[in-house]
């Protein structure tokens, strides 16, 4: 046997990771096997592995390895995303260290630098996934800006444009002054932030004033109206009149609109269509022309803006404007107020709103195609509740702003004629050809749109483009649609719904059959991990400390029902201990083979029990894999390995091995081989190493998945009675304060025949022998099918034992009384954190239960 005494993941995992990376599991579209396809959510090319990636890919790899062993042509398509904003920001920061900006380089040179960075650093995360054991088809690795994916993007846009679904129009958009690009609503994060609410008064035409409340006084100069609720009696007499914008000579109408909240502020709303989404909608209804006073750099500009504010940053302008309003008598009051601050999800800068032309995708007609499919059950969701969430979003979807003012990304294939201003987009049949003259007027003076597509535009094509679409490739014919999409619920709208749109529109069917949505990985307190909080758990550090198998197993074990995961390092310790337990069990089996001399070949009760339980386990665990309930599958295999195999069967097998029973050795080997197969999808490194040592076969990943055998219910029932007898004896020893190895004598009642028929096994496991008669005084432990009685005479000083128990009983009752007083205090329950109250309640229950057990033991001894 060549297994070292102790398991060290560092000596095992890297060699297998290297082997799988060098010899990837390449899919064959012509194999004739049923396909099973997973599209890997492409991580950002800028990224390093975080816990979300580790969870996501652990689940995907478990499914792909399971299906590969089930005989499917298992295809896991990997790749990375060009991550427009994120990548551009990374390279801009590198330039900043050189004292340069992207504008100093110009677009062409800047893009050369980005590609250079991508080639040097962009493969980091895929290398890290390989270290985690990801058995993807690395020969099919894709990048959202490589040649094939770029063709897909151009073709999709050409189709959308010529079908009237892609159009260019000026609209109010989210704008990041730092990243200098528009953002979709899904790329904007809103956080409650301490701020101020300012009440300002406007002079009303004909005399008097009207007061409004705002958190953005610097935008007053862009007001185009004051709106009040039509049913607000306070202001009904002012509707139709005009008010003057403070510090200006601009008069604006006072109008009625039902969108106004009567109970907010003064009940009157300043309407600033160019700088607020609600105001933009009100302006659209009332025909108000938007006026902007903040430019794309976030600075004040425009004729309406007082000279003292022009050119100032918007936040500096806010402070200065408040001073001017105060001095002029327009500031009624200033109060603390929690504002919903909208920020760029990439850089954290507070966003601005701006109106200028953008490319949009009409989502309503596209969503209808998806909704029909979802309503007829085309796509299953796990957990099922997310299906309704998906449908609700699609039913209320708005047009998608698909253009971004970046340099890194897919440049939009649209050209503008400098003579007649016509838009030129290549037709689908010539989608790769750049136009040389205007289709409308024939002019050769064409200028290409400088914007790029939103990163999610290319990501939305991922299930198609990874298979070679729009070409009719063998992969596309064989592997579309995919089977399972595994991803976090946080990108359901950003990505999953948009892939559904692409699939139904371009392929006429669903892009995948099932969507498995998992939760976020949080810290042990349930907080989102972030560098600023200092609570980030680095998966690579965990791999170094516990092993990749332990990390994978812990995350899978915790991924229940799509809920967020609170990751405590104790779970990683649990998984590492599990790996060690399995390793030691395998070493025992391998050691048992050395020098073994067969003297008999008879199935023991323990052999029959283990084979029967294994058959049941195979059936249940297979069903859980099929149901995509990987967390429960992990728990079932953990119980089967740790409890049934290691704790019970291995121990029960030792007397038979000592007696030279070949059937028992064979059972050990066969059961271990099956357990390694069941666990392989979740713990591929250790199981591969042990399977090779056990069987001499090179690649467990290519072995067949086990099939359930027959059940032996008689053996299971008999062995359960034996287990209960052993458990009862062990419990009695613990109650009496005796060491587990202490030899004792007990009297058994109930279903005792299995003990009598397997006396050697009972004696070995329980370290006990049987009394022929029931003792008068004894400690008693009742189990469902067996009751054990153990007299204390001859084992210990009964009176001393009694004194110790009575003393402990008093201590427990005192502790319980203290807990009861604390829990009865209204102040404690109201002020203490929920987890503190729950811990105190648990302490009370435990102390009362222990006290009751001691009372019972004392009454038994008499």
Curated annotation (Swiss-Prot):
The lineage of its organism: Bacteria, Thermotogati, Deinococcota, Deinococci, Thermales. It comes from the Bacteria. It is found in: Cytoplasm. Its EC number is 6.1.1.9. GO terms for molecular function: aminoacyl-tRNA deacylase activity; ATP binding; metal ion binding; valine-tRNA ligase activity. Disulfide bonds: none annotated. A motif ('HIGH' region) lies at residues 43-53. GO terms for cellular component: cytosol. Keywords: Aminoacyl-tRNA synthetase, ATP-binding, Coiled coil, Cytoplasm, Ligase, Metal-binding, Nucleotide-binding, Protein biosynthesis, Zinc. Its cofactor is Zn(2+). It catalyses: tRNA(Val) + L-valine + ATP = L-valyl-tRNA(Val) + AMP + diphosphate. Catalyzes the attachment of valine to tRNA(Val). As ValRS can inadvertently accommodate and process structurally similar amino acids such as threonine, to avoid such errors, it has a 'posttransfer' editing activity that hydrolyzes mischarged Thr-tRNA(Val) in a tRNA-dependent manner. One of its GO terms (biological process) is valyl-tRNA aminoacylation. ValRS has two distinct active sites: one for aminoacylation and one for editing. The misactivated threonine is translocated from the active site to the editing site. The C-terminal coiled-coil domain is crucial for aminoacylation activity. A motif ('KMSKS' region) lies at residues 528-532. Monomer. Residues 802-862 form a coiled coil. This is Valine--tRNA ligase. Zn(2+) 2 binds at residues 417, 420, 438, 441. It holds the Pfam family tRNA-synt_1. Binds 2 Zn(2+) ions per subunit. ATP binds at residue 531. Zn(2+) 1 binds at residues 176, 179, 344, 347. Belongs to the class-I aminoacyl-tRNA synthetase family. ValS type 1 subfamily. Its main location: cytoplasm. The keyword Flavoprotein does not apply.
């Amino acid at each position: 046997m060549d297994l070292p005494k102790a398991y060290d993941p560092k000596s095992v995992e890297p060699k297998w990771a290297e082997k799988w990376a060098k010899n990837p599991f390449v899919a064959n579209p012509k194999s004739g096997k049923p396909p099973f396809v997973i599209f890997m959510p492409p991580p950002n090319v800028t990224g390093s592995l975080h816990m979300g990636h580790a969870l996501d890919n652990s689940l995907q790899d478990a499914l792909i390895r399971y299906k590969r062993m089930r005989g499917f042509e298992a295809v896991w398509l990997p790749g990375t995303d060009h991550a427009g904003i994120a990548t551009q920001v990374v390279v801009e920061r590198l330039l900043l260290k050189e004292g340069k900006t992207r504008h100093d380089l110009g677009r062409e040179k800047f893009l050369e630098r980005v590609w250079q960075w991508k080639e040097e650093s962009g493969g980091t995360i895929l290398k890290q996934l390989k270290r985690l054991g990801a058995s993807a088809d690395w020969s099919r690795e894709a990048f959202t800006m490589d040649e094939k994916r770029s063709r897909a993007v151009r073709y999709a846009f050409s189709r959308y444009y010529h079908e009237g679904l892609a159009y260019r129009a000026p609209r109010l958009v989210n704008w990041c002054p730092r990243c200098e690009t528009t953002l979709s609503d899904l790329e904007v994060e809103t956080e409650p932030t301490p701020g101020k609410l300012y009440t300002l008064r406007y002079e009303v035409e004909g005399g008097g004033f009207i007061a409004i409340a705002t958190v953005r006084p610097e935008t007053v100069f862009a007001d185009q109206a004051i709106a009040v609720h039509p049913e607000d009696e306070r202001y009904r007499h002012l509707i139709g009149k005009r008010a003057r914008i403070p510090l200006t000579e601009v008069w604006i109408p006072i109008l009625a609109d039902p969108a106004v909240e009567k109970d907010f502020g003064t009940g009157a709303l300043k309407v600033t269509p160019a700088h607020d989404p609600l105001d933009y909608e009100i302006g659209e209804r009332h025909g108000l022309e938007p006026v902007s006073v903040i430019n794309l750099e976030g600075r004040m500009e425009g004729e309406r803006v007082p000279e003292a504010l022009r050119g100032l940053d918007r936040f500096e302008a806010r402070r200065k404007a408040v001073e001017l309003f105060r001095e002029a008598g327009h500031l009624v009051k200033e109060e603390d107020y929690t504002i919903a601050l909208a920020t760029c999800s990439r850089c954290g800068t507070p966003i601005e709103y701006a109106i200028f032309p953008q490319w949009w995708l009409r989502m309503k007609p596209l969503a209808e195609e998806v909704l029909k499919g979802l309503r007829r059950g085309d796509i299953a969701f796990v957990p099922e509740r997310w299906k309704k969430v998906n449908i609700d979003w699609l039913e209320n979807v708005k047009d998608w702003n698909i253009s971004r003012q970046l340099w890194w990304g897919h440049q939009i294939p649209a050209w503008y004629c400098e003579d007649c201003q016509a838009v030129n987009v290549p037709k689908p049949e010539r989608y790769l050809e750049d136009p040389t003259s205007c289709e409308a007027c024939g002019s050769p003076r064409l200028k290409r749109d400088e914007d790029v597509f939103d990163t999610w535009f290319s990501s939305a094509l991922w299930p198609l483009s990874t298979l070679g679409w729009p070409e009719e490739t063998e992969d596309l014919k064989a592997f579309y649609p995919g089977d399972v999409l595994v991803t976090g619920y946080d990108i359901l709208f950003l990505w999953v719904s948009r892939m559904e749109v692409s699939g139904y529109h371009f392929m006429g069917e669903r892009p995948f059959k099932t969507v498995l949505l998992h939760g976020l990985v949080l810290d042990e307190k349930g907080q989102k991990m972030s560098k600023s909080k200092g609570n980030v758990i680095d998966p690579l550090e965990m791999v170094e400390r516990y092993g990749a198998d332990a990390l994978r197993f812990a995350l899978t074990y915790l991924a229940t029902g799509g809920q967020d995961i609170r990751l405590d390092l104790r779970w990683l310790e649990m998984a590492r201990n599990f790996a060690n337990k399995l390793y030691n069990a395998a070493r025992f089996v391998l050691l048992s083979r050395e020098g073994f001399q067969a003297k008999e070949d008879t199935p023991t009760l323990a052999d029959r029990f283990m084979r029967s339980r294994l058959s049941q386990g195979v059936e249940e665990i297979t069903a859980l894999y099929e149901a995509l309930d990987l967390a429960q599958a992990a728990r079932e295999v953990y119980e089967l390995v740790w409890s049934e195999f290691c704790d019970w069967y291995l121990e029960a097998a030792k007397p038979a091995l000592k007696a030279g029973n070949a059937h028992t050795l064979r059972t050990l080997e066969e059961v271990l081989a099956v357990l390694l197969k069941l666990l392989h999808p979740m713990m591929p490194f250790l199981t591969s190493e042990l399977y090779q040592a056990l069987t001499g076969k090179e690649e467990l990943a290519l072995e067949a998945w086990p099939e359930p055998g027959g059940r032996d219910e008689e053996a299971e029932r008999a062995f359960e009675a034996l287990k209960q007898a052993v458990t009862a004896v062990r419990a009695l020893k613990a109650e009496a304060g005796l060491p587990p190895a202490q030899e004792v004598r007990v009297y058994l009642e109930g279903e005792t025949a299995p003990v009598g028929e397997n006396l050697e096994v009972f004696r070995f496991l329980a370290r006990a022998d049987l009394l022929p008669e029931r003792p008068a005084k004894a400690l008693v432990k009742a189990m469902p099918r067996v009751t054990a009685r153990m007299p204390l005479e001859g084992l210990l000083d009964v009176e001393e034992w009694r004194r110790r128990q009575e003393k402990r009983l008093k201590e427990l009752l005192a502790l319980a009384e203290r807990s009861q007083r604390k829990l009865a205090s209204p102040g404690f329950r109201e002020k203490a954190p929920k987890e503190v109250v729950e811990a105190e309640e648990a302490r009370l229950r435990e102390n009362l239960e222990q006290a009751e057990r001691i009372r019972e033991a004392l009454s038994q001894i008499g």
